[in-house]
């Protein structure tokens, strides 16, 4: 027994018809695609309204605005970030390394004040 049974033939025919309909549904009409209207932010609305009159000075003002935004985002902000990192993470922390003070003996002079350390008092009743 070779070939398809009547049930299998019917199923294959229905699948082919379904595929044909699906492919036909994928074709776009001339009105498609329908895109939603773009919502503009307040700055974009302002600049579109400002640039409707195409005078040269308006274009120059817009160019200066765009360049200032570029400088702010690509120069100033990175410099601030690098400065913050260098200030708080790379530089040595104050008092991070503690050095022992040198010993002071009688007769030594303290450099900051010029004070001379007096000789130690002798206590005859104590041995050392």
Curated annotation (Swiss-Prot):
GO terms for cellular component: mitochondrial inner membrane; respiratory chain complex I. Pfam families: NDUF_B6. It is a single-pass membrane protein. InterPro entries: NADH_DH_b-subcmplx_su6. Signal peptide: none annotated. Keywords: Acetylation, Electron transport, Membrane, Mitochondrion, Mitochondrion inner membrane, Respiratory chain, Transmembrane, Transmembrane helix, Transport. One of its GO terms (biological process) is mitochondrial ATP synthesis coupled electron transport. It is found in: Mitochondrion inner membrane. The modification N-acetylthreonine is found at residue 2. The modification N6-acetyllysine is found at residue 24. The chain crosses the membrane at residues 68-86. Accessory subunit of the mitochondrial membrane respiratory chain NADH dehydrogenase (Complex I), that is believed not to be involved in catalysis. Complex I functions in the transfer of electrons from NADH to the respiratory chain. The immediate electron acceptor for the enzyme is believed to be ubiquinone. Belongs to the complex I NDUFB6 subunit family. PANTHER family: NADH DEHYDROGENASE [UBIQUINONE] 1 BETA SUBCOMPLEX SUBUNIT 6. Complex I is composed of 45 different subunits. This is NADH dehydrogenase [ubiquinone] 1 beta subcomplex subunit 6. It comes from Gorilla gorilla gorilla (Western lowland gorilla). The lineage of its organism: Eukaryota, Metazoa, Chordata, Craniata, Vertebrata. The gene is NDUFB6.
